[in-house]
Amino acid sequence: MSDICDANKLKYRFRGYFPVVIDVETAGFNSQTDALLEIAVTLLKMDNEGVIGIDKTLHFHIEPFEGANLEPEALAFNGIDPTNPLRGAVSEKEAFLEIFKAVKKAQKASDCHRSIIVAHNAAFDHGFVSKAIERCDLKRSPFHPFATFDTATLAGLAIGHTVLAKACIMAGIPFDNKEAHSALYDTERTAELFCHIVNRWKSLGGWPLLAVDEQDAQSDTEA
C-alpha cells in the first residue's frame, strides 16, 4: 500500500480491524463463575494525518448474574459493593446490547470489517467479555473471538514497562493511583497508552510500511 492517504485511514492500519479499548472490574478471576461488575469501552478514531485518538467512552455498572460468585478479596481490592443501589447497575444483556450497538456503528463508520479488543493484560478482559456474551446468548458479536491487542505486551516493547500505571507515567500520561481499578478510569488510561504507542511508532517511521517495489527502489538508490 503506497498511497499515504490510504495509509492514514483506520481501516488500513490494523488490517480492517477496529480497535475497541475495554476494561472490566470483576468479583474474582474466574470468568465462568465470578461476577462481572463494571465495564467501560472506549472507541477510537483516526484523523486525516493518521493520528489515532479517543472518540468516546461507554461505561456501565453491571448486576451480578444469577448464581455468580463474589470473592470478598476481589471486592475489597476494587472497592465495589454490588448491593449498593446507587451504582445504577444494569443487566449484562442490557449493557452488551448498548455496547454492540455503539461498536458496530463506529466500526461501520470506519469501514472496518470486525472489531478487536484492546486491553491491559487482555486475556483477562477478553475472557470475561466473551463469557458474558455467551451467558446472554447474544449473536453476531462484533469482537474477534480470540485475537486481541494487549497493551501490557505493547508497553513492554515500546516503553520498557508492563504495569499500566508505570507505563503511562513513562509515556508522559498522568496516572492517579487513587482513581485506579475503576473500569472507566483504567479504560481511558489504557486507550491513551495504546494511542501513544501507535502514534509514536508512526512518528518514528514504522508506519506506513514501504511497499515491496518501493523498498527495492530505495535499495537500488542507496546502492
UniProtKB/Swiss-Prot annotation:
Residues 20-194 form the Exonuclease domain. The record marks F29, F77, F124, F146 as: Important for substrate binding and specificity. It comes from the Bacteria. It holds the Pfam family RNase_T. One of its GO terms (biological process) is DNA replication proofreading. One of its GO terms (molecular function) is 3'-5' exonuclease activity. SMART domains: EXOIII (SM00479). It is an enzyme of class 3 (hydrolase). The active site is at H181. Keywords: Exonuclease, Hydrolase, Magnesium, Metal-binding, Nuclease, tRNA processing. Binds two Mg(2+) per subunit. The active form of the enzyme binds two Mg(2+) ions in its active site. The first Mg(2+) forms only one salt bridge with the protein. Mg(2+) 2 binds at D23, E25, H181, D186. Its EC number is 3.1.13.-. Mg(2+) 1 binds at D23. One of its GO terms (cellular component) is cytosol. Its cofactor is Mg(2+). Homodimer. Trims short 3' overhangs of a variety of RNA species, leaving a one or two nucleotide 3' overhang. Responsible for the end-turnover of tRNA: specifically removes the terminal AMP residue from uncharged tRNA (tRNA-C-C-A). Also appears to be involved in tRNA biosynthesis. HAMAP family: RNase_T. Belongs to the RNase T family. This is Ribonuclease T. It comes from Shewanella baltica (strain OS155 / ATCC BAA-1091).
